[in-house]
């Protein structure tokens, strides 16, 4: 079994309301000015 750890950050956009991060809800959403999650694999270990 291989277990991986992720390091996630919230991408913030200057145009978002009050500087709060938010996620796009769908393709039909007209307001896509907010940031989203950006994840990177930190490390993987074998158990």
UniProtKB/Swiss-Prot annotation:
Disulfide bonds join 4-34, 8-39, 22-44. Expressed by the venom gland. It is found in: Secreted. The keyword Magnesium does not apply. GO terms for cellular component: extracellular region. InterPro entries: Hwtx-2-like. SUPFAM superfamilies: omega toxin-like (SSF57059). Is toxic to insects. Reduces amplitude and frequency of spontaneous firing and inhibits voltage-gated sodium current (Nav) in the dorsal unpaired median (DUM) neurons of P.americana. This is Mu-theraphotoxin-An1a. It comes from Acanthoscurria natalensis.
